[in-house]
């Protein structure tokens, strides 16, 4: 009979097969009350599942990450229960867990409304209050088919067809409602009280726009009401920081239907874009990169040689001219290999670092487009390093240091790094993978920061490191990457002459720091809520007069600021100074300069910040020095 070993090393013996819940009850009623599921021999199981042999057991509660995931998954089933009670004609599809929540895809003869969502949420609360047990039944395949046939759940039947090897499946019963899942799920609805439905959107069966359209109901769920309230507060703050709203309020950019996924940059937004580009250009020049420019449209044969045509054609914009097929480039790498291939290269020439602010276009699904965060036309701070196998380690180490320095300049101190290693299907021999993976791991260790290993998550052509930023709301944004490529140099005939006077393929390192300018600017807007550090602010100073008699002096101050490289404007409107200050504060301009008769007479300016702090009266030269110091500190400088 089973001996159960607990995480602290304690053991419990039973003279009969025992469920996870029974083990929890034997430890104490408090633990049993909070038992969501169990981890038996490192495998998640339901609380009702029996343990028949000697095993290790961890009791899973809502405090555990796995417990929270199970709660969210069970909430998705609860959505199904409520929907079927309110809308019997609905057909249930799938309801997975996503980051911080869940969703359920549903077929309905009409779109759900916000009133429908409110009704579904209310019904879910009533079902939770019934405090019913969720019953699991392992069911033979034929019986599963009969259950869903009798209920008219055609999508569930299609999912069963996708699993021909499964002889029995888990059916989870929420009273009269039944759903199919591998589980585990909560044993009782009492664990589901801290939830909220968040939005409705469209989806497609199997994610394919050619298939029938579905409705997707999103929700979030947490271990307790306090966590839920904190999440809702964070989401409300995120909505206030939505880059689309701020972009409109600050006149940065707009999107329109005639050019879906393409950005119309306004003067203010384009200023931020140019500051980023000029900054990255200098960073790359200072670190040994050669800036190049390659064509936007390239003959389709190059994409066939590179392999993109076979694997990426659905995301490529194509065109035809004079009996030739072309593609608008979705990425820059094949073009950079063409530049490398011009002229014979020696091992003495390596590494060669080619950088481009590459304008790319990808035919992303219209439903996935999101402001400037997810677009069809974008510019990458793209570069490719061509090096020998022995140079991988140093190049990666240098890139990691450079990337972390750049992120600090933008005010991001928390950076997550992940190393993705060889998948089962791959090109290149194991010795090359061993060398590349060790080089990347050693470079990460040398950086002195924590990093995460993702076994098997690398691309088929090489391992990679991903860099993710954490913003002020705790959200994580994957931005930078460095990717070893053993494949493209071979496909596109890139080679160099070795020290032994033989030909060999270089290793190609794909790398980007910001990712795309558009998305990175969107991240900055939301991180700073539009209150950009002075070096990124489209307008750094606004000079305002109190009466018309100071207008000429105000323009002279603006001219001097511009002569010294500051981005400055004047506000000479015949309005009260308080009104002008309030209006320019809403525009998030870092410094507001006021000139009255006294300032004109003394040749000074009165300076206040956008937060309302009065910095007092100072000379124009002193103010210029102040701004230049702030700009030099970049994202490390906070305007009080």
Swiss-Prot record:
Residues 1-61 form the TGS domain. Its main location: cytoplasm. Its cofactor is Zn(2+). InterPro entries: aa-tRNA-synt_IIb (IPR002314), aa-tRNA-synth_II (IPR006195), aa-tRNA-synth_II/BPL/LPL (IPR045864), Anticodon-bd (IPR004154), Anticodon-bd_dom_sf (IPR036621), Beta-grasp_dom_sf (IPR012675), TGS (IPR004095), TGS-like (IPR012676). It comes from the Bacteria. Homodimer. GO terms for biological process: threonyl-tRNA aminoacylation. The gene is thrS. Zn(2+) binds at residues 333, 384, 510. It is an enzyme of class 6 (ligase). Keywords: Aminoacyl-tRNA synthetase, ATP-binding, Cytoplasm, Ligase, Metal-binding, Nucleotide-binding, Protein biosynthesis, RNA-binding, tRNA-binding, Zinc. GO terms for cellular component: cytosol. It is found in: Cytoplasm. Residues 242-533 are annotated as: Catalytic. It holds the Pfam family tRNA-synt_2b. This is Threonine--tRNA ligase. Binds 1 zinc ion per subunit. It comes from Acinetobacter baumannii (strain AB0057).
